[in-house]
Amino acid sequence: MPFSVAHMERIEVDQEEVLAHENWLKMLEVQSHAGPCVTGFRLLKPVIAFGFVPIWQGVAEAWMVGSADARKYPITMTKTGRAVMDIAKISMGLHRLQITVRNTDKRAESWAYAIGFGQESVMKKYGPDGEDYLMMTRF
């Protein structure tokens, strides 16, 4: 379903990197206008959202916000994550798709590998809280 910030008001977000942004809902609203984004539902409840911000021709950065409910279905979420990334890459004509992952969030890093991303670099003090982040890419 097309993304709406109202969906996020119904998701129990526990991602430290999202919550570190004081106005994270406003940030998502702005990003949602920059490129395609969708919300995934289970039993009429939003559980995950994906978005893509074009940087320039052929390159975009993806974002994802998930709920604790989404983690109850790891196989489904991983297959969905791969499919959404594939669809975005094809439909947007991308030769590079990138994400940032908080360096201390090993669960998110592992999931990024599972959906086809590889580590490119460490971005020192990149986060809003001064934490290091990984730049991960998918070609």
Language model segments and positions:
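Short amphipathic alpha-helix that is part of the acyltransferase structural core
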Residues: M1-W24
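Active-site rim helix/loop that mediates acceptor-substrate recognition in acyltransferases
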Residues: V18-C37
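Charged interaction scaffolds used for protein-protein
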Residues: Q31-A34, F41, Q57-V59, T80, ...
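Conserved beta-strand in the GNAT
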Residues: T39, L44-P54, A60-W63
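Conserved acetyl-CoA binding element of GNAT-fold acetyltransferases
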Residues: G58-T78, L134
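Conserved acetyl-CoA-binding loop-helix of GNAT-fold acetyltransferases
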Residues: Y73-K89, S110, A114
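Conserved beta-strand-loop-alpha-helix junction that forms the acyl-donor binding cleft
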Residues: L94-Y113, Y126-G127
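Conserved catalytic-core motifs of GNAT/GCN5-like acyltransferases
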Residues: T100, G118-Y133
